[in-house]
A protein has these predicted regions:
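Short glycine-rich His-centered loop
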Residues: 23-54
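Intrinsic low-complexity/disordered segments
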Residues: 18-19, 33, 220
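Hydrophobic alpha-helical membrane context
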Residues: 15-16, 50, 206, 231
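Conserved active-site regions of diverse hydrolases
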Residues: 84
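Hydrophobic h-region of N-terminal signal peptides that target proteins for export
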Residues: 11-19
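Alpha-helical cap/lid subdomain in secreted, periplasmic
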Residues: 3, 27, 59, 63-78, ...
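Bacterial N-terminal signal peptides that target proteins for export
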Residues: 1-9
Length: 241
């Protein structure tokens, strides 16, 4: 009898726990969350919007949309992925009005920078170019969307595949961009997700190729790691999980 009473009591306790642990409690019903960036965010997403199995891609953004959507269905939040493979800040800027500002998201997540390295950018842009362009983009965004919460993701790299041979040299340039993201976060009072530190620490638990299959694109385990850290940082900044 006592076991049965405990089981019945649990039915009333569990929903209360679920409500207390609701992710992103600062968001309201029908709010929109937009993910912007390059191929890491793109995740091979389907473009037309007719295939809802693949509309978010296969990445950290998908994991977050799945978890938050399942844990908080009552709010009917909308998740939109606008990441495009191969893009850097100049390409984001060209489509920013259509793919970001016009959407008026409640929460905007940006991860860009790996394609802004001299070895990747066709224009061979410098760190100063990256800072000026990214800073201008954020200034325009903050002015146009004063109520939108913005989180910045730090670009990252691991010594895997073709990035292994020149890893030290590439990291010199990448670190400049990582420091720029930190400065821009401080300037506009935006939280920054330090993915490089996250992956460096994870490499003490498993080899780098467990987390990234080519040095810049995460494996499913890497995307899972990113999603957990994203949620931790965002909830720490604006709410509690």
């Amino acid at each position: 009898m006592s076991r049965r009473i405990c089981s019945v009591a649990a039915l009333f306790v569990l929903p209360a726990l679920a409500i207390a642990q609701e992710p992103l409690p600062f968001l309201h019903a029908k709010d929109m969350i937009v993910f912007q960036g390059d191929s890491i965010t793109d995740g091979g997403r389907q473009r037309t919007g007719s295939d809802y199995n693949h509309i978010m891609g296969q990445d950290y953004a998908y994991i977050l949309a799945a978890e938050i959507g399942a844990e908080s269905p009552e709010r009917n939040l909308t998740f939109i992925n606008r990441g495009i493979s191969g893009e850097g800040v100049p390409q984001l800027t060209a489509r920013w009005q259509r793919d970001t500002l016009a959407l008026h998201p409640a929460l905007l997540s940006i991860l860009v920078g790996i394609n802004d390295l001299p070895s990747a950018a066709p224009t061979r842009e410098t760190a100063a170019d990256y800072e000026a362009a990214y800073g201008k983009l954020l200034a325009e965004t903050v002015a146009a969307l004063p109520a939108t919460k913005i989180v910045l993701g730090e670009p990252f790299m691991l010594p895997v595949g073709r990035f292994k041979a020149n890893y030290a040299a590439d990291m010199v340039e990448l670190k400049k961009r990582q420091e720029i993201v930190d400065r821009l976060g401080a300037r506009y009072h935006l939280p920054v997700i330090h993915y490089q530190k996250l992956f460096d620490a994870a490499c003490s638990r498993a080899p780098a190729d467990h987390w990234s299959w080519d040095g810049i694109h995460p494996t499913y385990a890497g995307h899972g790691l990113m999603a957990k850290e994203w949620l931790r940082v965002v909830d720490q900044q604006w709410g509690s999980r």
